[in-house]
Amino acid sequence: VAEGVIGGSPTSGPLPGSPGLDKPIYTISVAAEILETHPRTLMMYENIGLVVPQRTSTNRRRFSQRDIYKLQTIQSLTRQHGVNLTGVRYVLALLKALNDHGIPPPDALKDIDVSALKI
């Protein structure tokens, strides 16, 4: 997962004076650079419904900080935990359900904070 993400962390929230978590500020090329991945990968995630960036009036994608956090989580699940993309959708939904019911996640997934993600 890329380091040095601008705007705080999911648990600490945005830094003072920075845009909110849901403000669409990153173009696809900037988001890809932050995540150290190819823009086409982000387009694939969008096509299968894992992330839904907002669109400008000219139909250009804009990713929010919350989208970046979600994409980092997807990267963590696929790279560190070996989960395929179908499994990612299932794991995220399961983690959200556990979080909604106040149940802690399994030890292997404690590093994933779903509270800041829109799932």
Feature names for model-found ranges:
Residues R60:
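Conserved catalytic core of two-component sensor histidine kinases, primarily the HATPase_c ATP-binding
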Residues V1-E33, M43, N47, V52-P53, ...:
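Arg/Lys-rich, alpha-helical DNA-contact motif
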